[in-house]
Amino acid sequence: MVKVSPFVKLLRGEYELTVLLLLAKLRGKARADEIIKAGKKTRTLPALNGARVAGARKFLVKNELIEVEREGKEIIHVLTKKGAKLGKLLNSISDFIIKDLKWTR
């Protein structure tokens, strides 16, 4: 069996990239419902739901891009330094695509 690097998995995983991008736009800390709500407002990103955020969370935690904090029953997603750096770059790329190239989905 061939091992696929986390980099390739991240590029293929649009939900993981979406969660990172939305967390960066939400100041690096948010609950799952806040991430889903922010995703619905953009209308250009893939649609998220609780299961998709949970699947993305597993990958992002494993690769140290986010950390999970618990406040009672709520799970708070927090970007790590690596995740914040990657989120900032993704945000710059998305702004370039939307504003300068005027691409639409």
Question: Where does each model-flagged region fall?
Answer:
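Short alpha-helical segments that sit at the start of domains
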Residues: 1-26
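Amphipathic alpha-helical dimerization/coiled-coil segments
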Residues: 3, 84-105
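DNA-binding alpha-helical recognition surfaces that contact promoter or target DNA
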Residues: 21, 37, 55
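Short helix-capping/hinge SLiMs at alpha-helix to coil transitions
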Residues: 24-28, 42-43
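Short amphipathic alpha-helical interaction segments
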Residues: 46-63
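A short, conserved structural fragment
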Residues: 61-71
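Basic, amphipathic "hinge/linker" alpha-helix immediately C-terminal to the N-terminal HTH DNA-binding motif
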Residues: 72-90
